[in-house]
């Protein structure tokens, strides 16, 4: 026996306080928890009584809840700004479903999360989070007076997306950042496309679709004359507002394709293929819709288009979903198309302590957004 640390059960006394050892900490030149060489080593690694206080492997619930709350507040603030265009623009009414699906994807990813890794220095991430508040505050301020300005929507969405990646990295290191990226990426499907790009895409695809529809009508024995994106038949002229639903079918098909890709667990390459196939299918179905509307107008007159317009658009959505689901079932049978997801390791290393500070920073910054916006406009009105 002796008076060293081994005789006191691996504890050191320092003015009445106890210093606890952690696995991996070096004491007397040897890491705690590693098997030492030699028979007479006083701290056998296999004997738990010599390790009175090891690092807990159970996840830190407080850190986890801070992680959840910070992410929730960020995305709720974004969805609150996007809700205006979801409600006023029928092209983006599918946006109401995106938060629900994104939450499901995040919950699914959480149940299969890998073991977290300790990130390196956390202060650069905290500085980056603080820096992201500047563009987010600017976009939030402008959207208060111009709620339909889509570049500001994307600026705000980009800041929220980047902040979410930083939070995931702080909580579980690079493994969590990679694992949860798709859940954050999917939520961006709710953001409207830039207006100029949307108008250009709609116009170009409508021109091509009108030409194809005119060719099909002429091949079927129905005289059709195409002028730009208008189709003239014997009963009247069908304009783009009658024959093309804009980008609704494209964004909704893209959303469904991304959702099925996660549901079936496809690899990245097959998810991209599924998304492209969904967009192509939506466009071909849109041409079929033009053809159906022309035939309906020829049988019942131009006025009947009001009765066929919305049902035809709804049919496109259902057919697109059915096609993507059938294609997903077929792709699932291909060898190597899917990735087996394993349940989350229990217990796993605790999340990094820096996530608590970062989450508090995010919560405070997000709470300041409406306050600074209101203060700004009150100050401007007082001038």
What are these regions (language model features)?
Residues 2-4, 9-10, 16, 24, ...:
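Residue-identity detector for glycine
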Residues 4, 37, 48, 57-58, ...:
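Compositionally biased regions
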Residues 9, 31, 38, 48, ...:
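Low-complexity, Gly/Pro
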Residues 16-18, 46, 288, 374:
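N-terminal functional modules and adjacent low-complexity/disordered segments of proteins
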Residues 26, 33, 52, 381-382:
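Short linear sequence elements within intrinsically disordered, low-complexity coil regions
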Residues 41-43:
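Tryptophan (W) side chains
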Residues 54-383:
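Hydrophobic N-terminal alpha-helices or hydrophobic patches in metabolic proteins across all domains
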């Amino acid at each position: 026996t002796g008076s060293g640390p081994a005789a006191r059960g691996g504890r050191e006394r320092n003015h009445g306080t106890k210093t606890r050892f952690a696995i991996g900490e070096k004491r007397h030149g040897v890491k705690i928890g590693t098997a030492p060489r030699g028979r007479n080593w006083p701290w056998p690694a296999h004997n738990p009584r010599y390790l009175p206080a090891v690092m807990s492997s159970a996840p830190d619930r407080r850190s986890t809840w801070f992680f959840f709350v910070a992410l929730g507040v960020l995305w709720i603030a974004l969805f609150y700004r996007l809700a205006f265009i979801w409600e006023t623009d029928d092209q983006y009414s599918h946006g109401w479903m995106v938060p629900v699906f994104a939450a499901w994807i995040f919950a699914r990813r959480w149940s299969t999360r890998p073991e977290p890794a300790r990130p390196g220095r956390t202060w650069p991430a905290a500085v980056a989070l603080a820096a992201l508040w500047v563009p987010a505050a600017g976009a939030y301020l402008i959207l208060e007076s111009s709620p339909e300005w889509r570049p500001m929507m994307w600026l705000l969405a980009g800041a929220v997306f980047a902040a979410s990646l930083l939070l995931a990295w702080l909580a579980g290191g690079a493994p969590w950042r990679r694992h949860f990226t798709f859940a954050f990426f999917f939520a961006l499907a709710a953001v409207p496309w830039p207006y100029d790009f949307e108008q250009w895409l709609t116009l170009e695809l409508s021109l091509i679709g009108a030409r194809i529809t005119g060719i099909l009508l002429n091949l079927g024995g129905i005289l059709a004359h195409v002028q730009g994106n208008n189709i003239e038949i014997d009963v009247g002229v069908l304009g783009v507002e009658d024959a093309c639903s804009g980008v609704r079918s494209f964004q909704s098909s893209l959303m469904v394709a991304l959702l099925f890709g996660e549901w079936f667990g496809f690899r990245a390459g097959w998810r991209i293929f599924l998304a492209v196939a969904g967009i192509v299918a939506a466009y071909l179905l849109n041409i079929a819709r033009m053809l159906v509307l022309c035939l309906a107008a020829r049988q019942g007159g131009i006025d009947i288009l009001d009765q066929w317009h919305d049902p035809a658009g709804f049919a496109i959505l259902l057919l697109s979903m059915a096609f993507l689901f059938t294609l997903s079932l077929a792709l699932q049978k291909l060898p190597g198309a899917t990735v087996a997801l394993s349940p989350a390791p229990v217990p796993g290393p605790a999340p990094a302590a820096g996530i608590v500070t970062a989450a508090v920073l995010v919560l405070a910054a997000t709470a300041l957004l409406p306050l600074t916006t209101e203060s700004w406009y009150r100050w401007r009105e007082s001038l």
